[in-house]
């Protein structure tokens, strides 16, 4: 009986040893990918979501890393707050000054440029204030005229990167917009574009989201190509000290992937076929 038990024990130990060897003999990349599997929470702007960019990129990220990215699309201010509260692993946002403050405060590990597009002023196709004719590349002049004429303007009003840019532009104008003409929506970019369309109002939008929705809107680009309208996006892994549950390895994997040659090439191609030009221009440091 003792001999039988000894034989059974030996067989079991041999089986375990063979299993371990099999795991070690797996292709190196496959083992690493299995270890990396899991999920991350990506807090990002509504513009990267509404434009369709993330639907285009993230399946490739998951395919390459085995990591699923769960997206929370909010304004940049809310995304940064999620990072501060330890409720996101990595951020993809577009308000560089606020992002740099976030990192300087120790809430993020580092910030790196990913891509850019630009902001535009859009409005009714008939352009009641004739801004496109008179001020096609002067956003400060256009906002001043909108305020003077008390013409309906829709603000994001959500502490997003777009909202922060709009407020900075009003500061340059020297005006604090208020009154019935100025509508603070507290909504994402897609919803605000729909509101501007329905109310025949002007609004500031990022070019990518506007182009992705243009076919369903009665809005035209009114002011563009002003240096004040540059729109840079950055990636920030959240400091894992903010929350013990933060997936620091997954966040680092996303940062490295979004800055990689493959991802940068994908970003540069997105929108070319449908719109004749990319919705975002990759500019990660080489």
Curated annotation (Swiss-Prot):
InterPro entries: ABC-Tungstate_binding, PBP_domain. A lipid is attached at residue 21 (N-palmitoyl cysteine). GO terms for cellular component: plasma membrane. A lipid is attached at residue 21 (S-diacylglycerol cysteine). It is found in: Cell membrane. Its main location: membrane. It holds the Pfam family PBP_like_2. Residues 1-20 form the signal peptide. Keywords: Cell membrane, Lipoprotein, Membrane, Palmitate, Signal, Transport, Tungsten. It is a lipid-anchor. PANTHER family: EXTRACELLULAR TUNGSTATE BINDING PROTEIN (PTHR37945:SF1). Monomer. The complex is composed of two ATP-binding proteins (TupC), two transmembrane proteins (TupB) and a solute-binding protein (TupA). This is Tungstate-binding protein TupA. It comes from Peptoclostridium acidaminophilum. The gene is tupA.
């Amino acid at each position: 009986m003792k001999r039988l038990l000894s034989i059974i024990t030996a067989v079991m130990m041999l089986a375990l040893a063979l299993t371990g060897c099999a795991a070690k003999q797996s292709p190196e990349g496959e083992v690493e990918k299995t270890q990396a599997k899991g999920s991350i929470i990506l807090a990002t702007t509504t513009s990267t979501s509404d434009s369709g960019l993330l639907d285009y990129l993230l399946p490739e990220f998951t395919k390459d890393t085995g990591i699923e990215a769960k997206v929370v699309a909010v304004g940049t201010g809310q995304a940064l707050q999620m990072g501060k509260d330890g409720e996101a692993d990595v951020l993809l946002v577009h308000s560089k000054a606020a992002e740099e403050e976030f990192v300087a405060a120790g809430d993020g590990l580092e910030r790196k440029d990913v891509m850019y597009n630009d902001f535009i002023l859009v409005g009714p196709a008939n352009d009641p204030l004739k801004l496109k004719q008179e001020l096609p590349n002067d956003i400060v002049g256009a906002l001043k005229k909108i305020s003077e004429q008390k013409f309906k303007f829709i603000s994001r009003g959500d502490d997003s990167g777009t909202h922060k840019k709009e407020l900075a532009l009003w500061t340059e104008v020297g005006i604090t917009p208020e009154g019935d003409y100025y509508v603070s929506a507290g909504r994402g970019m897609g919803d605000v574009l729909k509101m501007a369309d329905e109310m025949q109002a002007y609004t500031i939008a990022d070019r990518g989201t506007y182009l992705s929705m243009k076919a369903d809107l009665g809005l035209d680009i009114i002011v563009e190509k002003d240096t004040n309208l540059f729109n840079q996006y950055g990636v920030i892994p959240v400091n894992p000290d903010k929350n013990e549950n933060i997936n620091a390895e997954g966040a680092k994997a996303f940062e490295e992937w979004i800055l990689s040659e493959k991802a940068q090439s994908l970003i540069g191609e997105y929108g070319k076929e449908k719109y004749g030009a990319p919705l975002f221009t990759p500019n990660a440091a080489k």
